[in-house]
Structures are given as C-alpha cells and as structure tokens.
C-alpha cells in the first residue's frame, strides 16, 4: 500500500511513520507547512515532500493520472485542522487514518459520514488504548464480574499527568478553540476506553478547571470514575516520571504508562486488514469531551479526586 501524510513535521508523526514502515508499506509523499522533517530520513528518505498544499494535491492528481494509487492519508496535524484534512483525503480518493480526536464537534461526525458515502472511502480513528494488553485483560475481567452481578458499579480513580514546559502556553494546545482543552487532549483516548469498558454516560461533573489541570467525576452505566488530568509537575508529587498514567479499580492499580510502543503498529495492522475503528467508534468519546468542555465547574465533594480538592495554594 502507498501512503500520503499531512503533518509529517509534527510530534506524533514518527509513530505513524514507524507504523507504515513496520507494517511493510511505503510513504509516497507528505505535506507540512514547516520544513523541519529530517525524521523522514529515518523512515522514508525517498518520499516526496511539500510545504505547499496545492503542490501536494497536484502531486496526488498526477500520481492518479499515471495509474499510481495512493491508498491512505495519515493525518498528524493539530486537532482543529482534522476535519479539513480528512475531507481533503476523501476528496482525493484516499482512506484516511487520523489522530485522536477526529474532530472537536460531534456534529462533524455526521458530515464525515456523508463524505465517506459520497467518495466511497473510509475514515479511521486511532484508539490505541483499546488495544493495550491491560485494557484487553480488564475487559474480560469486567465481563466476568458483570456476568455474576449485572448491576455492579466499579469504583475507579484515574490520574494522568504529562509534564509540559512553558512553550505549551504559547502553542495551539493552550487554545481551547483549537485543541479542545486538556479534557479533550489528554482525556479523549481515556474516555473512549472507559466507555468501551463500562458502558454509556449517566452523569458527569467538572470539579476543577484551570489552564494546567482539569478534573471531575464521570458516572457510567457500570462505573463511578473520579479523574484528574494535569500538565503541572507539582501535581506529580514524589514520582519522577515525565508521564504518569494510573487507573485504580476497586483498589487494584493498573499502570497504563507502559507498553505503548507497538500500539500504533497494531492499529495500522488492523486497519490494513479491513478492521480498525471508524466514525461510529469515535463518536461517544468526542461527544463526552465536547459536553465536558461546556460544563460549569461544581464544588468538589467526597466523591471527587483528591487533586480536585486542593487549591493552587495547597500544592
């Protein structure tokens, strides 16, 4: 299979480049407005590169005219550009593999469905946490518990801290209109996995929301989840990790920080084998993140995450 890519200079692009290479396929061409794409030398030094979208599209059209089919477009760009870049790929006759979240507004999912139908191509969302070995094992354990007690509600605490420097607040990520905010950036994959494991949303609250952290309580069909996401190193406590991602279920801790290296490769394998996750799979977590983004903050209570109960002056 031949691939094209938009955003080959982005921080997430190497995971996609490795997945394309390690599944035995080739990157024909890529586009990025920035030309710091030396990473291509490691994976596909012979691929074409463009900094102008019109030149990129012209190359795609010429390739098609010559009978060279470019099958997939990988989208590795900032979140607010995803819809336009997915539409670009479909319009140019490619299936699209896009970083999570696919879009910020759930109403755009239906628009993408219409475009899929129009162009007869698929849009795939990367939901790597669903493929994590601990998630798969947990899915079986939860099923077993619910077989015994269909009304069971699991008690869960999630803490996700990913330390970022001052650059973050000058980047597109700090703009909620472009990134969706921390609950979307850090949470959409986790929310997707929780919905996959524990069922639909019954209620939700936000207990703390600041530029560097957000947290609340999520009530699902089979889980009560207190959650907290942060980019502030002061929230790390004594831990020395750059990324801290922990889930505690009924007192048992699951470390979701490890073993991520192969999840993108496995995601690509499944997509290329006519599997993968589509628009319907992505919808629930995008809708939840959108709704959380539009909630007012409620005072924390005894059910809230401990870090939601601390004031900034207490850190």
Regions found by a protein language model. Give the residues of each.
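N-terminal Rossmann-like dinucleotide-binding module
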Residues: 1-46
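A contiguous active-site-proximal alpha/beta segment in oxidoreductase catalytic domains
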Residues: 103-166
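Rossmann-like dinucleotide-binding domain that binds NAD(P)(H)
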Residues: 166-235, 280-287, 308-309
């Amino acid at each position: 299979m031949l691939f094209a890519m938009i955003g080959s200079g982005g921080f997430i692009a190497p995971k996609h480049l490795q997945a394309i290479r390690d599944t035995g396929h080739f990157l024909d061409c890529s586009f990025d407005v920035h030309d710091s794409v030396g990473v291509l030398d490691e994976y596909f030094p012979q691929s074409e590169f463009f900094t102008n979208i019109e030149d990129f599209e012209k190359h795609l059209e010429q390739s098609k005219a010559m009978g060279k089919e470019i099958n997939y477009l990988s989208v590795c760009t900032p979140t607010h550009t995803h819809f336009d870049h997915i539409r670009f790929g479909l319009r140019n006759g490619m299936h699209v593999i896009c970083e999570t979240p696919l879009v910020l507004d759930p109403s755009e999912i239906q628009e993408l469905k219409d475009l899929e139908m129009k162009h007869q191509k698929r849009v795939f969302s990367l939901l790597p946490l669903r493929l994590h070995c601990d998630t798969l094992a947990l899915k079986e354990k939860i099923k077993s518990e619910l077989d015994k007690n269909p009304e069971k509600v699991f008690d869960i605490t999630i803490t996700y801290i990913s330390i970022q420097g001052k650059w973050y607040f000058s980047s597109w990520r700090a703009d909620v209109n472009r990134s969706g905010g921390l609950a979307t950036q850090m949470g959409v994959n986790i929310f997707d996995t929780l919905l996959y494991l524990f069922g639909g949303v019954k209620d939700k609250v936000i207990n703390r929301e600041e530029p560097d952290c957000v947290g609340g309580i999520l009530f699902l069909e089979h889980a009560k989840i207190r959650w907290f996401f942060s980019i502030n190193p002061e929230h790390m406590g004594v831990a020395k990790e750059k990324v801290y991602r922990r889930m505690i279920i009924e007192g048992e801790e699951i470390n979701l920080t490890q073993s991520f290296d192969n999840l993108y490769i496995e995601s690509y394998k499944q997509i290329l084998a006519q599997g993968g996750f589509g628009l319907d799979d992505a919808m629930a977590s995008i809708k939840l993140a959108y709704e959380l983004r539009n909630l007012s903050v409620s005072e924390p209570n005894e059910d809230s995450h401990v870090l939601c109960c601390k004031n900034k002056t207490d850190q």
